[in-house]
Amino acid sequence: LCGSEKYPVRDPFFMMTRRSLNTFMNAMTSSDWTAYPFASQNDKDFNNLLDVYLDAVFFSRLHELDFAQEGHRIEFSEEGNPDSPLEYKGVVFNEMKGAMSSAVSQLWQGISSYLFPTTTYHYNSGGDPAEITDLSYEQLLNFYKTHYHPSNAIFMTFGDLDVTDFHNTLEEQALK
C-alpha cells in the first residue's frame, strides 16, 4: 500500500516499522482473503497502528505511478541506455517471478488450476507473471472499489483492550 487519505506518504508501513513499538506488522494475500495483522503491547501504539491500517486499507490513494512501481512497467534493461532491450519490471511482478521459479510452486499452481477450474482457487493469488502485465490500472481500481470495503471485511482482535473503544474506532474510521 502506497499511502492513504490521512497518510499520503510513500510507504506508511515502512515508516511505521521504524517509529512503532509494534511486536508484529505484516500483510498477506491468499486466494480468497487478504490479512493485515499487527500487534503492539502499548495501547497508544496499537491505536496508531489501527488508524494507519484502517486508512491504508479502506482509503488507499492508489495513484497510477504507484501502480507502475508496484505492479508493472516497461524499462530499458540497462538504466540510462536507450539502446538496451525493454523489459517488464515492478515489485509484484518481480516477486511473483521469484515465487513461481521453483518446480514445487509451479506444480502446486498447476494442480490447483485443474482441481478448481471455476473458483478463485484456480488463480495464483499473487498473480501469474505471464498475466500480470495484462492488468490495467483501471482494472486494479475496479477490483479495489469492489472488494476493499468494510462490508466485505472481518475485524478480529484479542488481548487486553477496551472493546468499546475498538468498536468506536472502527465505526468512526471505517464504517461511517
Question: Across the structure, where does each feature detected by a protein language model lie?
Answer:
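Scaffold signal of the M16-like zinc-metallopeptidase fold and its non-catalytic homologs
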Residues: C2-E5, N48-H63, G80-S151, T164-K176
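M16/MPP (pitrilysin/insulinase) zinc-metallopeptidase core fold and M16-derived inactive scaffolds
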Residues: L1-D55, F59-S60, E64-G71, S101-S105, ...
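Residues in well-ordered beta-strands of folded domains
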Residues: N26, P37, F93, S112, ...
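Second-shell loop/turn segments in exported
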Residues: C2, T34-Q41, E75-G80, K97, ...
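Conserved alpha/beta enzyme-core scaffolds, especially Rossmann-like or related mixed alpha/beta domains
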Residues: L65-E75, H147-H149, T157
